[in-house]
Amino acid sequence: MSFDGMDFETRAVHVGSAPDPATGAVIAPIYQTSTFAQEEVGSHKGYEYARTGNPTRTNLETCLASLEGVAPGRPGGGLCFASGMAATTTVLQTLAPGDHMVLSADVYGGTYRVAARLFEGWGLRLSVVDMTSLDRLKQAIRAETRLVWVETPTNPLLGVVDIAAAAEAAHAAGAVCAVDNTFATPFLQRPLGLGADLVVHSSTKYLGGHSDVVGGALVTPLPELYERARFLQNAAGAVPGPMDCWLTLRGVKTLALRMRAHCHNAMRVAAFLADRPEVAEVRYPGLPSDPGHELAARQMAAFGGMVAFRPAGGVEAAKRLVAATEVFTLAESLGGVESLIELPGEMTHASVAGTDAEVPADLVRLSVGVEHPDDLVADLAQALERA
């Protein structure tokens, strides 16, 4: 049965999850195998070696592609990797020495690290700009620009980038526009429908949703780009195991339900923080006062589960606060059902200290989970009082 054209929630449950034809099992099995029997030399049933392909991985790739707008049987598709950084690295490997890349100044620290500390050494030319300013983005694009890398909302400052405008600027220079859609997920934002050429995810985060699996993915409708990335996936071999794929596929089934709860709770938390005298600044696109609010309202279905803020007492107050929460767990990562709190400057973004992508030392980042919002607000209230 084709689920093309059905709503997001239906496709999240059913695409890539057909009942097993051999047994009738409603949930597709985990194909925990490294190799596949061949009928004769050069003749097999679609799989030969698990680095090249595995049915469980295919199921997940098909599902994620559908959710991002590339239906089964259409040009392009989805590819899964052992981590979000493996997916990012694969995209950068499509570039050649001398090519130029434009990267957001507010970006995941690992993305900056691999671009600036690894690929620049191999001949990549890199410009880091504030992409919330379209003028600055356009000024950074050169004749040799081949990739414009967008994060929106950005990590960790929750800036909002105009995807359609960024894609148009990239295409005018003959460049590819890639969007890291990890924070928003395809439930809230569909970059391909706004003109982007490629979407990247850390599926560790909201797609998996339970903090129990590490993975990455990319989706593109462009056949040539898909085939190049597929070659690199197989050649470099940074692929997820079947158990990781199965766990992620299980998580995706409840993505819509979880994202609604994340968004609702994040709005409650952000509004609470905005009214507290101990808080100097709150960044959340859902607040009408946020500089990215109007744009986010146009290109997102809701505003996501991430909140950032700066305590009025500076970095020492921030350190005391993150150590004082009881419901929020002090930990890196994001997107799980449980609420997390961290200091990006010393944790997830420590690698960008002293660079153009450095984040404020007193910034606190929240991954707001699906607990009861009253408990989350109460926890932050007591932590602010103790800090």
Question: Where do the language-model regions lie?
Answer:
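Conserved PLP-enzyme active-site core in the AAT-like
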Residues: 2, 14, 67, 73-278
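PLP-dependent enzyme catalytic core of the Aspartate aminotransferase-like
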Residues: 72, 116, 125, 139, ...
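Short, well-ordered beta-strand elements within core beta-sheets of diverse protein domains
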Residues: 248-257, 304-312, 364-369
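Conserved small-domain helix->loop->beta segment predominantly found in fold-type I
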Residues: 267-326, 330-335, 349-358
